Amino acid sequence: VHLTPDEKNAVCALWGKVNVEEVGGEALGRLLVVYPWTQRFFDSFGDLSSPSAVMGNPKVKAHGKKVLSAFSDGLQHLDNLCGTFAKLSELHCDKLHVNPENFRLLGNVLVCVLAHHFGKDFTPEVQAAYEKVVAGVATALAHKYH
């Protein structure tokens, strides 16, 4: 993903303030609530019957943290997202059969959650940089599908 030096600085500065566990759990939870068809990949997570059940589910929170930890690793390798996410792409494509559109949806939800958590600090410029990053990550995760 191509970011200007200012965009890279903005992404990294904000990411340094992100609580990966909290934001990850909220982002994955919102994905499962807003796009309920994505729940089919999480049958083993137990009760996902209502928004409050999803948002309070410890397995959702734990997996959200895992997802955002991987995203965090990707931020260290913005020039090689396909390489960074190659194994996860293969897993989600070949074994889990996740629709690659779901990566884009999760990226959009993550941007919303970051905006909610950071308010005025999540300026339009910061949002634009994050939009580039989540699009790049979604493309990298979908790489094995092509």
UniProtKB/Swiss-Prot annotation:
Transmembrane intervals: none
UniProt entry keywords in alphabetical sequence: Acetylation, Heme, Iron, Metal-binding, Oxygen transport, Phosphoprotein, S-nitrosylation, Transport
Modification type N-acetylvaline: residues: 1
Protein's UniProt keywords contain Phosphoprotein: yes
Residue span(s) of domain Globin: 2-146
InterPro entries associated with the record: Globin, Globin-like_sf, Globin/Proto, Hemoglobin_b, Hemoglobin_oxygen_transport
Keyword Transport appears in the UniProt entry: yes
Disulfide bonds listed in the record: none
Subunit-level organization: Heterotetramer of two alpha chains and two beta chains.
Name the UniProt record assigns to this protein: Hemoglobin subunit beta-1/2
Organism whose genome encodes this protein: Otolemur crassicaudatus
Encoding gene (name): HBB
